[in-house]
């Protein structure tokens, strides 16, 4: 009887110990080297609130990488004609840099290259000032935009083979990297529907994958000369038909074979918003570092995070560094996002799922399991 009581007591103590023990956390640098956040750069008017957001929201959650979609929201000195009407000054940017440095956050500026040179009926700064760079100048800009349309117009592209385009673009790439004191640059390059069009006098009829790879490589080599990395979105490198992923998060226009033509030190930002697709394994096996990028579905974001950690842990040691981390994406302006974030606004059009909800959910889980 005495022996039975001792055994029972030991079981009770063990049970209580298991219930009260803290979850053994692992170093975040080991679990997820990149813990990112991607958002549009603020306007000058909202700079102070954005700095507060960095200090009070990003830093405590252990975000260590901030990709800022700057585009033409900067007072470029090298190409002043490409400035937006309301753009950040050098002094404004230095405040962002200081806030990031104080919180050990790596800041990476983004300017969309190749695609996304228009939006709906609005032509972007580059093609507005340099219409000769347009890949499809014969496509009329609609007064009232709708999708789908007969021209397959989503966003315009510049022609990567125009002899003057890089002499305009590379000075602003260098300038924005310099002012942000950045060792990397995000070139976008997602959702490129117009490329190698038959009517283009320079690239018509050419292999679209080779054109895409050529532009990636040209940008990469320019950055490498200054010891900077190139980051891009990964959708054009996935076969949308074979995978069933479609024309947005993958390619329908045969650019996917460029994955075997571009430098292996390009960092791939792999975005999938409705499913936890296993494409990080594809990119890692091709030799790239890959970052998974969710948007507005918290459960998908957490599933993707768990996949990334599992891939990293269970792969051969040569593969482990390729699984680089996670980056929450925001596709509204920073002002709209911060309003929605602080007021916890709901999105009735997406079953209540929001980008601020995904950000909270993802980083709550990241900080639960790591330190």
PLM feature spans:
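Electropositive, surface-exposed helix/loop patches at the edges of structured domains
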Residues: 99-121, 140-172, 268-288, 325-371
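Secreted/extracellular small peptides and ectodomain modules produced from precursors
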Residues: 3, 16, 36, 198-201
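Flexible loop residues that form catalytic
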Residues: 9, 42, 71, 273, ...
